[in-house]
Structure formats: structure tokens, C-alpha cells
A protein has these predicted regions:
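A generic structural signal for alpha->beta connector loops
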Residues: 108-110, 133-135, 187, 213-215, ...
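The AdoMet/dcAdoMet-binding core of the Class I SAM-like
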Residues: 3-4, 11, 28-30, 42, ...
Length: 283
């Protein structure tokens, strides 16, 4: 149906039967009572929405396998520390931006993607998420429950899990992060996208720092008003910034992302103790 938000055109893709009332659906979109995720398409980009205020995911139609939103690019900064992950777990499918980038750029990595909303999974074709195969599995599951049952040995755990109210409630607790740490390899790491109202995630920063023995770096994504949090399983992890600067240049050439700029923010945030500062803030 035509987009009710964009006066210059565009359309909305919804998970509704052909006979559904377009006028009723339009009204639900505008007053934010529509309960399912939906897709906005302006002819150049495609967006996943849970409501009209926040973009959950974005895809450029001309480059569907690239990372459009800055926070997704910066979540790939884990490659600075784990450049050849064998096993990657992603909680939160969204529009599949991270799935596609990792699937096509890291062909030797086995990736499992967890999404607890079947309506989000039903939209995977709209975002050109590749079908499941030997190195990719998209599974309808709760991230916390899956971690309880899965085997140890995760190299990188990416968490980009949100609902219409903010960070996924089932993951916003100490038990989840303790379980996450226990399932990582000795040199494994956790990467979390923190977005939305800071009050909804501020307490989690301190929890993660406690669980991961203060081996946490948090850095801003000012373009998207997000933070990316990196937590390291190794209790004596110490970044070699000089070596990482050389690696960042190699990764930029290989993947086309600005890893030197990412590293500069990561190093600055680590030396300023941004994670500890944010954990101590009162909102």
C-alpha cells in the first residue's frame, strides 16, 4: 500500500491478507496501534519498522548486502579482535544486515541467527536474507533460552535484539550475560547494540562489567545515537593498540569499512573509561 508517512511516494509492505482494509491498516500505522513489524520502501532503500518513530534496519536496494546503518558497521569492529571467528551467534535478525554481511564476507564462519518474532522471520525475503545452508541457520527461538541449552565454544556473540519498547526484556538481566560469558571460548567476545532511551539499558552496562571482570569497552555511534559495547571473555585481555592500527588498515582494504576510524573511537573510549562512566550515570 502507499506509504502514509511519505508525501513524496513510497510504499509499505505488511504481513496481511489481500482482502485486508487498506484504510484500517493506514489508520493503525499512523496511530501506532499496528502490532506487527512492517517494511517501508522508498524506491532506493528498504526499512524495517516496529513503529513509525524508529528504524530497526535499513537496506540500500542497489547494494543489499552492504551495511547501511552506522551502528551495524561498528558492530563489525569485533573483527579487530577476532578476525577469523569459527562460530558466530547473532541474537536478533531484524532486516538481516549483519547476517548478510557476515555470511558473504566470512564464508568460513558458521553462523546461527536467533529471532523470537516469527513475523520478523517472515520478512526475511523482503530483505534478501539468503536461505539456510551449511554455514547459516535462522531459527525462531528466545536468545536466553537458546544459550542455556547450546554448547560452549562461541567465538563471537552479537546481540542486536529489540522489540517495540526497546532492548529485548528477556535479555536485560544478569543471568543472560552470565550465560553468555559461560558459552564463549576463552578468547571469545560479546558485542551488544545499545539503543533507544538510555534509562532502558543504563543498568545493564554495570552488570556486564561485573560479569566480564571489567573487560568491557563501550563506544558511541553518534550518527545513530547508539552505543556499541564490547565485552571480552579473557580476564587479562589487554589490547595491543599499535598492532591493531596495522590490522585496521588491512581490514579496511578487505571489507570496505572504516576500521581505522572504529579503532580510534574504541581506543579513546577505552582510555577514557567510557563504560565505567556510563555505568555510574543517573538518568
Amino acid at each position: 500500500m502507499p506509504s502514509p508517512f511519505d508525501p513524496h511516494g513510497g510504499r509499505v509492505l505488511m504481513l496481511e491478507p489481500p482482502g485486508a482494509s487498506a484504510e484500517a491498516l493506514r489508520s493503525q500505522l499512523l496511530d501506532e496501534t499496528y502490532a506487527k513489524p512492517y517494511v517501508m520502501d522508498d524506491g532506493e532503500r528498504r526499512f524495517l519498522h516496529f513503529n513509525g518513530r524508529l528504524i530497526q534496519s535499513a537496506m540500500r536496494l542497489a547494494e543489499p548486502n552492504d551495511l547501511d546503518l552506522r551502528y551495524t558497521q561498528k558492530m563489525m569492529s569485533f573483527l579487530l579482535f577476532r578476525s577469523r571467528p569459527r562460530r558466530l551467534l547473532l541474537i536478533g535478525l531484524g532486516g538481516g544486515s549483519l547476517v548478510k554481511f557476515c555470511h558473504y564476507r566470512l564464508p568460513a564462519t558458521h553462523m546461527t541467527v536467533l529471532e523470537n518474532n516469527p513475523d520478523v522471520i517472515a520478512l526475511r525475503d523482503a530483505f534478501l536474507v539468503p536461505p539456510d545452508g551449511p554455514n547459516l541457520k535462522v531459527q525462531e527461538a528466545d536468545g536466553a533460552e537458546y544459550l542455556e541449552q547450546t554448547e560452549k565454544g562461541i567465538d563471537v556473540l552479537l546481540v542486536d535484539a529489540f522489540d517495540s519498547t526497546g532492548f529485548a526484556p528477556s535479555l536485560a538481566n544478569r543471568e543472560f550475560f552470565e550465560q553468555a560469558r559461560s558459552k564463549l571460548t576463552g578468547s571469545g567476545m560479546l558485542v551488544v547494540n545499545l539503543a533507544g532511551d538510555a534509562q532502558t539499558y543504563a543498568g545493564l552496562i554495570g552488570v556486564v562489567m561485573q560479569v566480564f571482570d571489567d573487560q568491557v569497552i563501550m563506544f558511541p555511534v553518534r550518527e545513530d545515537h547508539n552505543y556499541v559495547l564490547l565485552a571480552f571473555r579473557d580476564p587479562i585481555f589487554e589490547p595491543n593498540w599499535r598492532r591493531l592500527r596495522d590490522l585496521a588498515k588491512e581490514l579496511r582494504s578487505k571489507y570496505g569499512l572504516d576500521f581505522p576510524a572504529f579503532l580510534e573511537k574504541i581506543e579513546r573510549s577505552a582510555k577514557l573509561g567510557l563504560a565505567r562512566h556510563e555505568a555510574g550515570r543517573r538518568y
